[in-house]
């Protein structure tokens, strides 16, 4: 479950609980570099490889990894080494994946994408896309929704209600 200010909450089966569930909360811990990078969770997404991604407001994109029963969050501060460095793309609102396995990330600062066929998160090469024009303003880059329709076309909705079709990408 995504929360505003209280981190990420995971529900696990627990037959000893009256509800049959146990809830585990993951919050940012400044002393733990493998903790989630922000407590403001906006979006979670599972890609075609089964990986769980977490979009955060102020914390960018996190990838959940699990080893020996321990959960770790990979992000720009500890494992996504190629993440944009200049302070943009830290408010992640939405994600989708195209039919070629490319993952698209909508942020308040524009669109970001990367090849989902990777073995090591440190090797992910992020590409960024921003609207720049004479009439451009912040709203042109503020992406609310990425939607893949039944024909696998990706649609981009930005602040102010503008809807764009992602036509060509390499």
Regions found by a protein language model. Give the residues of each.
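Carboxylate-rich, polar loop motifs that coordinate divalent cations or form catalytic acidic clusters
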Residues: 1-170
